[in-house]
């Protein structure tokens, strides 16, 4: 279902992402100035990876309103597809708001996270914080999947408690 707000509501199955963890509790989502993140991506990109590039945000911390851990790496079909030494994050099946953008880094990421923030502020989505997923279909594109609450009909629940 395509929203008038520039995102789609979709169902996703379980997604496994293998890669390297970056612990960044003080870095706000969408902010890219983190040398640890840059080093992790450099290390991942120097290996043969088992699937499309991806990144997950896991281990949500309400006290900082962000995630403690980001896994930078690649999607894999099974645990056996992961490169030795990489950790695996599991993004559960469910209903997601899919935000997509094209362009150059870091602007493309800043635009995406601004869209998420706007959708939350406007009450268009209510996030579940069970794990966010960034997928990179090609060098200048990012698809961002945000897990959301839905009502019994499958419509997004707003942050205000209203059903849409």
What are these regions (language model features)?
Residues 1-164:
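A solvent-exposed interaction/effector surface
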């Amino acid at each position: 279902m395509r929203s008038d707000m520039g995102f789609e509501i979709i169902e996703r199955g379980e997604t496994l992402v293998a890669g390297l963890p970056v612990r960044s509790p003080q870095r706000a989502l969408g902010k890219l100035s983190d040398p640890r993140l840059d080093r992790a991506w450099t290390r991942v990109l120097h290996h043969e990876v088992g699937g499309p590039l991806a990144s997950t945000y896991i281990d949500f911390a309400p006290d900082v309103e962000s995630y403690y851990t980001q896994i930078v790496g690649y999607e894999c079909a099974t645990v056996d597809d992961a490169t030795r030494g990489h950790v695996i994050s599991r993004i559960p099946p469910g209903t997601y708001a899919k935000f997509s953008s094209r362009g150059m880094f870091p602007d493309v990421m800043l635009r995406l996270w601004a869209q998420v923030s706007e959708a939350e502020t406007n009450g268009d989505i209510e996030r579940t914080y069970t794990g966010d997923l960034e997928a990179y279909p090609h060098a200048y594109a990012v698809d961002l999947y945000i897990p959301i609450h839905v009502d019994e009909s499958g419509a997004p629940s707003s942050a205000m408690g209203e059903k849409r």
